[in-house]
Protein backbone atom coordinates (compact mmCIF):
# COMPACT_ATOMS: atom_id res chain seq x y z
CA UNK A 1 0.00 0.00 0.00
CA UNK A 2 2.72 2.34 -0.95
CA UNK A 3 1.72 5.93 -1.53
CA UNK A 4 -1.53 5.67 0.44
CA UNK A 5 -1.82 8.01 3.36
CA UNK A 6 -4.09 6.87 6.13
CA UNK A 7 -5.53 9.85 7.97
CA UNK A 8 -4.82 9.85 11.65
CA UNK A 9 -7.83 10.25 13.84
CA UNK A 10 -7.96 13.52 15.67
CA UNK A 11 -6.78 13.28 19.26
CA UNK A 12 -9.64 13.08 21.69
CA UNK A 13 -10.02 16.31 23.56
CA UNK A 14 -9.89 15.95 27.30
CA UNK A 15 -13.24 16.71 28.93
CA UNK A 16 -13.68 19.36 31.59
CA UNK A 17 -14.60 16.65 34.09
CA UNK A 18 -11.38 14.74 33.41
CA UNK A 19 -9.34 17.95 33.71
CA UNK A 20 -10.94 18.69 37.07
CA UNK A 21 -10.29 15.15 38.28
CA UNK A 22 -6.70 15.45 37.13
CA UNK A 23 -6.35 18.80 38.92
CA UNK A 24 -7.60 17.35 42.23
CA UNK A 25 -5.16 14.45 41.89
CA UNK A 26 -2.17 16.68 41.09
CA UNK A 27 -2.15 17.88 44.67
CA UNK A 28 -0.98 15.11 46.93
CA UNK A 29 -2.21 16.87 50.03
CA UNK A 30 -5.25 18.35 51.77
CA UNK A 31 -5.89 20.81 48.92
CA UNK A 32 -6.69 18.10 46.38
CA UNK A 33 -8.82 16.21 48.89
CA UNK A 34 -10.70 19.40 49.79
CA UNK A 35 -11.36 20.42 46.19
CA UNK A 36 -12.48 16.87 45.34
CA UNK A 37 -14.91 16.80 48.28
CA UNK A 38 -16.40 20.20 47.46
CA UNK A 39 -16.74 19.16 43.83
CA UNK A 40 -18.66 16.07 44.93
CA UNK A 41 -20.98 18.19 47.07
CA UNK A 42 -21.61 20.50 44.10
CA UNK A 43 -22.38 17.60 41.76
CA UNK A 44 -24.54 15.83 44.37
CA UNK A 45 -26.55 19.03 44.89
CA UNK A 46 -27.61 19.17 41.25
CA UNK A 47 -27.51 16.30 38.75
CA UNK A 48 -27.77 18.87 35.92
CA UNK A 49 -24.67 20.78 37.02
CA UNK A 50 -22.24 21.36 34.16
CA UNK A 51 -18.51 21.20 34.66
CA UNK A 52 -16.39 23.53 32.58
CA UNK A 53 -12.70 24.36 32.27
CA UNK A 54 -12.11 28.06 31.60
CA UNK A 55 -9.55 30.83 31.42
CA UNK A 56 -6.61 28.80 30.12
CA UNK A 57 -3.60 30.97 29.33
CA UNK A 58 0.19 30.58 29.40
CA UNK A 59 0.38 31.63 33.04
CA UNK A 60 -2.68 29.62 34.15
CA UNK A 61 -3.57 26.02 33.23
CA UNK A 62 -7.28 26.79 33.67
CA UNK A 63 -9.95 26.97 36.33
CA UNK A 64 -12.74 24.51 37.17
CA UNK A 65 -16.16 26.11 36.80
CA UNK A 66 -19.54 24.69 37.79
CA UNK A 67 -22.57 26.07 35.96
CA UNK A 68 -26.34 25.73 35.85
CA UNK A 69 -28.19 28.44 33.90
CA UNK A 70 -25.02 30.48 34.37
CA UNK A 71 -21.94 30.33 36.54
CA UNK A 72 -22.44 28.92 40.02
CA UNK A 73 -18.87 28.86 41.32
CA UNK A 74 -15.22 28.33 40.48
CA UNK A 75 -12.66 26.25 42.35
CA UNK A 76 -9.10 27.42 42.68
CA UNK A 77 -6.16 26.02 44.59
CA UNK A 78 -3.44 28.21 46.05
CA UNK A 79 -0.48 27.47 48.30
CA UNK A 80 -2.37 27.89 51.57
CA UNK A 81 -6.03 27.91 50.55
CA UNK A 82 -8.70 26.28 48.42
CA UNK A 83 -11.00 29.05 47.17
CA UNK A 84 -14.58 28.59 45.97
CA UNK A 85 -15.83 31.79 44.37
CA UNK A 86 -19.56 32.18 43.81
CA UNK A 87 -20.27 34.33 40.75
CA UNK A 88 -23.33 36.03 42.29
CA UNK A 89 -22.42 35.42 45.92
CA UNK A 90 -23.29 38.94 47.08
CA UNK A 91 -26.92 38.19 46.21
CA UNK A 92 -27.06 34.89 48.09
CA UNK A 93 -28.27 34.36 51.65
CA UNK A 94 -25.42 33.02 53.80
CA UNK A 95 -26.87 32.35 57.26
CA UNK A 96 -23.97 30.03 58.17
CA UNK A 97 -21.47 32.79 57.27
CA UNK A 98 -19.43 30.56 54.94
CA UNK A 99 -18.34 33.50 52.80
CA UNK A 100 -15.09 34.78 54.28
CA UNK A 101 -13.35 36.35 51.27
CA UNK A 102 -14.14 38.92 48.56
CA UNK A 103 -16.66 40.46 50.94
CA UNK A 104 -16.32 44.03 49.68
CA UNK A 105 -17.45 43.48 46.10
CA UNK A 106 -20.94 44.01 44.74
CA UNK A 107 -21.20 40.69 42.92
CA UNK A 108 -18.88 37.86 43.93
CA UNK A 109 -18.24 36.22 47.29
CA UNK A 110 -15.72 33.52 48.10
CA UNK A 111 -15.02 30.83 50.64
CA UNK A 112 -11.36 30.37 51.53
CA UNK A 113 -10.68 27.00 53.10
CA UNK A 114 -7.42 26.52 54.98
CA UNK A 115 -5.73 23.29 55.96
CA UNK A 116 -7.58 21.57 58.80
CA UNK A 117 -10.65 23.77 58.42
CA UNK A 118 -13.95 21.93 58.39
CA UNK A 119 -16.65 22.96 55.93
CA UNK A 120 -20.30 22.89 56.95
CA UNK A 121 -21.37 20.59 54.11
CA UNK A 122 -25.11 21.20 54.56
CA UNK A 123 -24.60 24.98 54.49
CA UNK A 124 -22.29 24.69 51.47
CA UNK A 125 -24.87 22.59 49.62
CA UNK A 126 -27.54 25.16 50.51
CA UNK A 127 -25.37 27.93 49.00
CA UNK A 128 -24.96 25.92 45.79
CA UNK A 129 -28.73 25.39 45.57
CA UNK A 130 -29.39 29.10 46.24
CA UNK A 131 -26.94 30.02 43.46
CA UNK A 132 -28.72 27.69 41.04
CA UNK A 133 -32.13 29.12 42.02
CA UNK A 134 -30.85 32.67 41.48
CA UNK A 135 -29.44 31.75 38.06
CA UNK A 136 -32.66 30.00 37.05
CA UNK A 137 -34.81 32.93 38.20
CA UNK A 138 -32.59 35.36 36.28
CA UNK A 139 -32.77 33.19 33.17
CA UNK A 140 -36.54 32.87 33.47
CA UNK A 141 -36.93 36.62 33.93
CA UNK A 142 -34.73 37.40 30.90
CA UNK A 143 -36.63 34.84 28.78
CA UNK A 144 -39.94 36.51 29.64
CA UNK A 145 -38.51 39.96 28.87
CA UNK A 146 -37.18 38.76 25.51
CA UNK A 147 -40.61 37.36 24.56
CA UNK A 148 -42.44 40.60 25.39
Each PLM stretch: what is its role?
Residues 1-148:
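Charge-dense, helix-prone N-terminal extensions
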Amino acid sequence: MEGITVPKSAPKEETAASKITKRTQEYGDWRGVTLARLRQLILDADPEMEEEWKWVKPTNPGVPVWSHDGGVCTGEVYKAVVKLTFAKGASLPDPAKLFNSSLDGNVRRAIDIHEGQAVDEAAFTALVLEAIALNSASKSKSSKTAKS
